[in-house]
Amino acid sequence: MRSSAPYHFGSPVGPEHFADREPELALLAGRMIGGISVIVHAPRRFGKTSLVRRGLLAAEAAGAGVGYANLLRCSTRREAAQTVVRAIFAGPLHRRDLLRRLGGLLERIRVRPTVEVATDGRVQLGFDPALADRDWGGAMGDACRILAEEAGRRPVALALDEFQQVAEIDAGLAGVFKAMLDEAPSVSFVLAGSHLHLMERLTTLPGAPLLGMGELLRLGPIPEPAMTAYLVRQSRRAGRPMDEAAARLVSALAGPVPNDVQRLAQSAFDTADAVIDAGCVERGMELAVSRQSATFAERYERLSGTAQRLLRLLAEGPVARPYARAVMTGLEVANDNAVRKALAALTFAELAVRTGGAWHVADPFLRRWLVSGAD
């Protein structure tokens, strides 16, 4: 049966929706198998998690033991330790004899985890929330020493996604993770993050605690020819072919973020009866905006008046000099501090981003909503 959803957005994509990134995938999988750590920097919705997961699958297929931990929901050291230790035992250490070996392994972790065994034999570890003041960094280090022993038998890779959250938990936690990497030099750690200013502070700026701890991989936009070929190919498989001009228009209106391109492509597909042309793309943009209009309105209403006016200004076109007198006059503010606060609020809410030396609205659908004055 032909698919009614040839494109995918909103969550990490599987192999069938993976558009390009083959060179990055080959590099990442090779480093995982080779025991070399990698630091992945990517703006949000650029396919970071999809790439990392595909790299883990490729490394596992080549015989590596792999694990994946998402730190986004961690707000304390205990939660970070629980997430990392769980990933280690559920991934690289999960072998047929794990249950037999489990007691001895857990004795080596200075904070004893709780243990649950699922019906399929999967082991779920945790730390009691009542245990407040414990050496959580030491517990992670203990687990990493066990992981290093496993790396003596086969390649081992552990991906720590949304790694920027480490900076939000506390100032010293990045040093704990550096010690972890030092404890297991033969393990490939993949530190992947999307808030670039935080990731740079953790990994690449002078004095960063994790500076030089892995090979840097920066994800940029998918090249337009590769994205066009993907859009056309997917539409043909689903029985509503998109012509190349329409595919290029999708990228022009929604790019450069792959997630946004796929969202618009799917909306254009939804409006088409047979062939997807430029008219379908324009109607698809209107449809995508209307589907998100309530969310846009809620986010807009939470902003201060100055931030609202600045966001509308950015929707009209990129602004290279936001502190210029003409900009402040248009925003009806008396000094650049008000502009600075508004930009900080828009950046924190991920509504505005600075690329190519200028500020602009981060979301193409929000930009269209602002320009059209939609309710």
Regions found by a protein language model. Give the residues of each.
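Winged-helix-like regulatory helical subdomains adjacent to P-loop NTPase cores
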Residues: 262-334
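A short, basic N-terminal segment
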Residues: 1-38, 43
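P-loop NTPase nucleotide-binding core
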Residues: 37, 42-46, 50-156
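Short amphipathic alpha-helical interaction segments
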Residues: 331-348
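Conserved Walker B catalytic segment
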Residues: 126-195, 204-206
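A short, conserved structural fragment
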Residues: 347-357
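Short, amphipathic alpha-helical interaction segments positioned at domain boundaries
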Residues: 365-375
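Helix-loop-helix "sensor" segment of P-loop NTPases
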Residues: 200-252, 273-275
